């Protein structure tokens, strides 16, 4: 088909890149326009191929595409948070059967994300250790929830 991976605007975007935020207060509430980015990463031209079945180089291309899109979206001063997510199958909410993922860039950092970051900072302040490193160490040691392990 002449391509290995494509990134396109979502046909039914939750947010639009064009326009101004027009952030303003309305009483105790704040409001703004639905500005942001909503993109679809088409991970392969082959309809039946998935991240699990594609060659390592294909997975590498997908991860590089995520990185490149995040770097580009960070250039837009209106955007504060980028989320990459993947739904697989109708039961998970995917509207396309073809292997794809999505990228959403928001003008705000979601409250839950801010709370998790603050919690990680507090943990580090009290223990002088990274909470995520401690979680990984514990999971590797206990192996209760581990599915597989490799050198990566």
Segments predicted by a language model, with ranges:
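HIT superfamily nucleotide-processing domains
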Residues: 1-152
């Amino acid at each position: 088909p002449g391509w290995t991976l494509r990134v396109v605007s979502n046909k039914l975007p939750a947010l639009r890149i064009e326009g101004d935020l027009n952030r303003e207060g309305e009483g105790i509430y704040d409001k703004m326009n639905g500005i942001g980015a909503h993109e679809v990463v088409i991970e392969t031209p082959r309809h039946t191929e998935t991240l699990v079945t594609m060659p390592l180089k294909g997975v590498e291309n997908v991860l590089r595409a995520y990185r490149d899109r995040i770097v580009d979206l960070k250039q837009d001063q209106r955007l504060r948070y980028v989320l990459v997510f993947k739904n697989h199958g109708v039961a998970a909410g995917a509207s396309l059967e073809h292997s794809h993922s999505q990228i959403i860039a928001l003008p705000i950092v979601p409250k839950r994300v801010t709370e998790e970051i603050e919690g990680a900072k507090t943990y580090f302040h009290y223990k002088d250790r990274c909470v995520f490193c401690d979680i990984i160490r514990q999971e590797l040691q206990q192996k209760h929830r581990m599915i597989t392990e490799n050198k990566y």
